[in-house]
């Protein structure tokens, strides 16, 4: 009594692996090695894989929405900011990966339309406490005209007075949001073989190439819309668009089928 004893969870884990073998480590964790499930709610693996997601409408231009390229002309993208004012007021990331075990987050939210994702190509929309979404998210979803955003960015670059939309605070039905779709491509498919020089060339700056690639890409669609449950003091997900770890796994396995990898 009065003593707290040590549980050698990490010691036993490393002793059972014995080397820098990540596959063995994952197998150990997945098989409840050291009874680790008694001490954690979930084990979530993060991989350096970013889904390449585009607007399905390529009529006027090819618009990448993840990672977002809207502000690349200003010298920053989804991971950095050009000025502190923007950094303090917005994030250019609207897509995020959620935990695989949705039972950990489901009690915090009401499903107001559809359902939580059950397939790798499904995305859930997470609203704010009062049922809203940011205008930046609406541009990414194509519910606001992205040309408006392009115009404001260009005016900022040119140090011109910025003309903002006059129809702010728009509302959208759940059906309008549920009808949103995206296109996803594999990053390995950005490369095409050049037989003249016997090399693979990055074609991501070739508009016609990218338009064809996006048009033939995989479709991602909205499976549901969720909103923080009334009375919930803390939630696991910030407002945005969330895909499951199954999508990441799909992307990891995908390059094995591409020509650049097979060659």
Residue ranges and their predicted role:
Residues 1-263:
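Basic-flanked hydrophobic alpha-helices used for secretion and membrane insertion
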């Amino acid at each position: 009594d009065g003593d707290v004893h040590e549980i050698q969870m990490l010691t036993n884990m490393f002793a059972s692996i014995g080397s820098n073998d990540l596959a063995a480590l994952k197998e150990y964790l997945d098989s409840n090695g050291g009874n680790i499930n008694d001490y954690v709610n979930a084990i979530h693996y993060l991989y350096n894989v970013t889904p390449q997601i585009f607007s399905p409408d390529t009529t006027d231009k090819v618009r990448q929405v993840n990672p977002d390229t809207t502000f690349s002309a200003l010298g920053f993208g989804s991971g950095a900011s050009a000025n502190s004012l923007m950094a303090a007021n917005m994030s250019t990331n609207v897509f995020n990966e959620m935990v695989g075990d949705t039972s950990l987050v489901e009690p915090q939210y009401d499903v107001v339309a559809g359902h939580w994702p059950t397939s790798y190509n499904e995305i859930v929309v997470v609203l704010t406490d009062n049922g809203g979404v940011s205008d930046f998210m609406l541009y990414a979803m194509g519910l606001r005209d992205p040309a408006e955003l392009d115009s404001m960015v260009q005016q900022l670059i040119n140090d011109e007075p910025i003309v903002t939309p006059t129809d702010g605070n728009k509302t959208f039905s759940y059906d309008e949001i549920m009808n949103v779709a995206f296109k996803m491509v594999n990053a390995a498919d950005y490369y095409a073989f050049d037989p003249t020089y016997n090399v693979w060339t990055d074609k991501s700056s070739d508009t016609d190439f990218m338009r064809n690639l996006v048009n033939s890409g995989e479709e991602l669609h909205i499976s549901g819309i969720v909103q923080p449950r009334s009375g919930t003091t803390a939630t696991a997900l910030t407002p945005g668009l969330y895909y499951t770890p199954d999508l990441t796994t799909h992307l990891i396995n995908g390059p094995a089928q591409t020509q650049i990898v097979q060659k």
